[in-house]
Amino acid sequence: MHEIIYRGTRYRTHGELPTLGSYAPDVSLVNTRLQDVSLANFMGMRKVLNIFPSIDTPVCAKSVIVFNKLAEDHGDVAMLMVSYDLPFAHARFHQEHALENVEGLSAIRHAGFGENYGVQILEGPLAGMFARAVVVLDENNTVVYREQIADIDNEPNYVAAYKALGIDVDPLELEI
């Protein structure tokens, strides 16, 4: 069990993030074209899983925009934005913000992602949604970085996530 903070109160999540060096669980998610996808669809690519409660909250929205911007020069990295939002919400957001470098993925059709990745919030007003986390995988789906953001209102450490991929990022690039 892990705990996250939302508006000053601690809430439990189901399990823990996958451990460093472990093989990431492969689960099915739904893309904006309503197709089932899994990590196997991105085999041979390094992957950043940006996991969050909802695309329609300011911090979540900013994280997607920042990861999209960071991905502009790194087409060999699959940027997977994962939430329980409907695929239509991801599609709308991508269109509104002209996002071309990230893949919006919904867990709505397939149970298990939140449990397998230890991000499903178990209690409180966000129960059933995902806690904010980033998991970085190498080409073979081995976990090379993981971050469970303690306070759900905080952004992930973008620089550390990219550093795990061997990519240096200027913090000024993160300004949107």
Can you annotate each of these PLM segments?
Residues 1-176:
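Chalcogenol-based redox active-site neighborhoods
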